[in-house]
Protein backbone atom coordinates (compact mmCIF):
# COMPACT_ATOMS: atom_id res chain seq x y z
CA UNK A 1 0.00 0.00 0.00
CA UNK A 2 3.05 2.25 -0.22
CA UNK A 3 2.29 4.90 -2.81
CA UNK A 4 5.01 6.59 -4.80
CA UNK A 5 4.56 10.28 -3.96
CA UNK A 6 5.87 12.61 -6.66
CA UNK A 7 4.54 15.98 -5.48
CA UNK A 8 4.63 18.24 -2.44
CA UNK A 9 2.46 21.19 -1.47
CA UNK A 10 2.83 24.34 0.63
CA UNK A 11 0.21 26.92 1.58
CA UNK A 12 0.44 30.38 3.10
CA UNK A 13 -2.82 31.65 4.54
CA UNK A 14 -3.95 35.16 5.46
CA UNK A 15 -1.13 36.85 3.48
CA UNK A 16 -1.77 40.61 3.52
CA UNK A 17 -1.73 41.16 -0.24
CA UNK A 18 -4.55 41.08 -2.76
CA UNK A 19 -5.04 37.73 -4.51
CA UNK A 20 -5.24 39.58 -7.83
CA UNK A 21 -1.68 40.87 -7.37
CA UNK A 22 -0.42 37.44 -6.29
CA UNK A 23 -1.92 35.78 -9.38
CA UNK A 24 0.16 38.04 -11.64
CA UNK A 25 3.32 36.66 -10.01
CA UNK A 26 2.11 33.05 -9.97
CA UNK A 27 1.39 33.16 -13.71
CA UNK A 28 5.10 33.82 -14.36
CA UNK A 29 6.37 30.73 -12.48
CA UNK A 30 3.72 28.12 -13.31
CA UNK A 31 5.14 25.05 -15.19
CA UNK A 32 8.74 26.25 -14.74
CA UNK A 33 11.56 24.35 -13.04
CA UNK A 34 12.16 25.27 -9.41
CA UNK A 35 15.57 26.84 -10.12
CA UNK A 36 14.09 28.97 -12.91
CA UNK A 37 11.14 29.97 -10.70
CA UNK A 38 13.49 31.17 -7.93
CA UNK A 39 15.46 33.22 -10.48
CA UNK A 40 12.27 34.80 -11.84
CA UNK A 41 10.97 35.64 -8.35
CA UNK A 42 14.28 37.14 -7.27
CA UNK A 43 14.11 39.75 -10.03
CA UNK A 44 10.36 40.38 -10.03
CA UNK A 45 9.74 43.96 -8.81
CA UNK A 46 6.38 43.05 -7.31
CA UNK A 47 5.77 43.06 -3.55
CA UNK A 48 3.94 39.74 -3.73
CA UNK A 49 7.03 38.03 -5.20
CA UNK A 50 8.68 37.71 -1.78
CA UNK A 51 5.59 36.01 -0.33
CA UNK A 52 5.40 33.60 -3.27
CA UNK A 53 9.13 32.87 -2.91
CA UNK A 54 8.62 31.89 0.74
CA UNK A 55 5.81 29.49 -0.19
CA UNK A 56 7.86 27.97 -3.02
CA UNK A 57 10.83 27.51 -0.66
CA UNK A 58 8.53 25.75 1.80
CA UNK A 59 7.12 23.46 -0.92
CA UNK A 60 10.64 22.47 -2.00
CA UNK A 61 11.62 21.79 1.63
CA UNK A 62 8.50 19.64 2.05
CA UNK A 63 9.42 17.67 -1.08
CA UNK A 64 12.98 17.07 0.09
CA UNK A 65 12.32 16.28 3.75
CA UNK A 66 8.97 14.49 3.66
CA UNK A 67 9.12 12.66 0.33
CA UNK A 68 12.88 12.40 -0.50
CA UNK A 69 12.46 14.15 -3.85
CA UNK A 70 15.43 15.75 -5.63
CA UNK A 71 15.26 19.55 -5.97
CA UNK A 72 16.88 19.49 -9.42
CA UNK A 73 14.02 17.43 -10.85
CA UNK A 74 11.16 19.51 -9.38
CA UNK A 75 8.74 21.61 -11.44
CA UNK A 76 6.06 24.06 -10.25
CA UNK A 77 3.04 22.01 -11.34
CA UNK A 78 0.31 24.06 -9.65
CA UNK A 79 0.28 27.59 -8.31
CA UNK A 80 -2.87 29.45 -7.33
CA UNK A 81 -4.10 32.15 -4.98
CA UNK A 82 -7.54 32.25 -3.42
CA UNK A 83 -9.19 35.16 -1.66
CA UNK A 84 -8.88 35.23 2.10
CA UNK A 85 -11.04 37.21 4.50
CA UNK A 86 -11.13 40.97 3.99
CA UNK A 87 -10.22 43.25 6.88
CA UNK A 88 -12.68 46.13 6.79
CA UNK A 89 -11.56 49.52 8.06
CA UNK A 90 -12.97 53.05 7.79
CA UNK A 91 -11.26 56.34 7.01
CA UNK A 92 -12.91 59.50 8.36
CA UNK A 93 -13.92 61.95 5.63
CA UNK A 94 -15.39 65.43 5.42
CA UNK A 95 -18.72 66.40 7.00
CA UNK A 96 -18.78 63.50 9.45
CA UNK A 97 -18.83 60.77 6.83
CA UNK A 98 -16.47 57.82 6.42
CA UNK A 99 -15.09 55.82 3.50
CA UNK A 100 -14.56 52.07 3.68
CA UNK A 101 -11.07 50.62 3.24
CA UNK A 102 -10.86 46.93 2.38
CA UNK A 103 -7.56 45.31 3.36
CA UNK A 104 -7.60 42.16 1.28
CA UNK A 105 -5.83 38.92 2.15
CA UNK A 106 -5.06 35.83 0.12
CA UNK A 107 -4.26 32.15 0.52
CA UNK A 108 -1.28 31.17 -1.67
CA UNK A 109 -0.78 27.51 -2.65
CA UNK A 110 2.19 26.11 -4.58
CA UNK A 111 2.55 22.45 -5.61
CA UNK A 112 5.87 21.12 -6.87
CA UNK A 113 6.14 17.77 -8.66
CA UNK A 114 8.85 15.66 -10.27
CA UNK A 115 9.28 15.98 -14.04
UniProtKB/Swiss-Prot annotation:
Keyword Ribosomal protein set for record: yes
Record-level Gene Ontology MF annotations: rRNA binding; structural constituent of ribosome
Signal peptide range in chain numbering: none
PROSITE patterns for this protein: RIBOSOMAL_L22
Protein family (similarity comment): Belongs to the universal ribosomal protein uL22 family.
Assembly information from the UniProt record: Part of the 50S ribosomal subunit.
Name of the molecule in the record: Large ribosomal subunit protein uL22
Species this protein is from: Limosilactobacillus fermentum (strain NBRC 3956 / LMG 18251)
